[in-house]
């Protein structure tokens, strides 16, 4: 008699664990990208470009388009950051993107 194959439920659970691990890895990588965390904000010249830049950013999970849900101001110590909360229109993965306004150059 031959070796039994893997049960369908066990194979499905293994695949689900693998997919969750891949999602965690992509989220960890996204946190290291510019704008992925408050420690790595994207520098912009004016608040007017914050939502445009956020909407132009691709989803880290599926590459889809992000839809801006909220554009807020957060204080982190003595620094003021802009944070855009967005959701992917394709896979519905949430994402926060951090921005810092560039200091104006002296005239």
Predicted regions and their residues:
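Intrinsic low-complexity, intrinsically disordered or marginally ordered coil/linker segments
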Residues: 42-44, 60, 65, 73, ...
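Residue-level recognition of well-ordered beta-strand positions that form the cores
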Residues: 85-87, 100
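Cys/His-rich microdomains that often coordinate metals
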Residues: 65-66, 95
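Short Cys/His-rich "knuckle" micro-motifs
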Residues: 69-72, 98-100
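Short cysteine-rich clusters marking metal-coordination/redox-active sites
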Residues: 59-62, 88-91
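Residues immediately within or flanking Cys/His clusters that coordinate Zn2+
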Residues: 55-56, 81, 85
């Amino acid at each position: 008699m031959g070796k039994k194959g893997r049960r369908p439920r066990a194979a499905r659970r293994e695949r689900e664990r693998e997919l969750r691990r891949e999602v965690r890895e992509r989220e960890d990588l996204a946190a290291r990208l510019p704008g992925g965390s408050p420690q790595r904000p994207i520098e912009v010249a004016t608040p007017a470009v914050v939502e445009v830049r956020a909407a132009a950013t691709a989803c880290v999970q599926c590459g889809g388009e992000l839809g801006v849900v909220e554009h807020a101001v957060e204080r982190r110590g003595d620094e003021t950051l802009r944070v855009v909360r967005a959701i992917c229109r394709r896979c519905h993965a949430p994402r926060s993107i951090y921005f810092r306004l560039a200091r104006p150059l002296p005239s």
